[in-house]
């Protein structure tokens, strides 16, 4: 398991953009997009790992991952 594995990964279809959008709420929004859901997920995982490395390189603390009830509460704020 990598440090990036702890973060939520969201892949959703965008009618406006006519493609899948991948994001990681704790680190960034709208990180990648494409027509193949699996490829977007794989790219999102790579971007998350790169972001984690950038945080470490810059000496910044990583944001806390959202999990369990926290995730549900955060998603309800958006809905």
Regions found by a protein language model. Give the residues of each.
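ATP-dependent carboxylate activation and anion-phosphoryl transfer catalytic cores
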Residues: 2-5, 20, 28
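Short, charged, surface-exposed hinge/linker loops at domain edges
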Residues: 1-8, 38, 42-79
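A short, exposed loop/beta-hairpin motif centered on an aromatic-Gly-Thr core
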Residues: 28-39
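Short aromatic-glycine-(Arg/Gly/Cys) micro-motifs in beta-strand/loop hairpins
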Residues: 12-26
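Generic helix-packing signal
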Residues: 26-28, 44
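Residue-level detector of beta-strand structural context in well-folded domains
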Residues: 9-11, 30
């Amino acid at each position: 398991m990598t440090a990036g594995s702890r973060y939520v990964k969201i892949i959703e279809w965008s009618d406006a953009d006519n493609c899948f959008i991948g994001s990681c709420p704790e680190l960034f929004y709208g990180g990648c997009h494409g027509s193949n859901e699996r490829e977007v997920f794989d790219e999102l995982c790579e971007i998350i790992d790169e972001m984690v490395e950038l945080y470490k390189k810059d000496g910044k603390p990583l944001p806390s991952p959202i999990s369990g009830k926290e995730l549900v509460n955060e998603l309800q704020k958006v809905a």
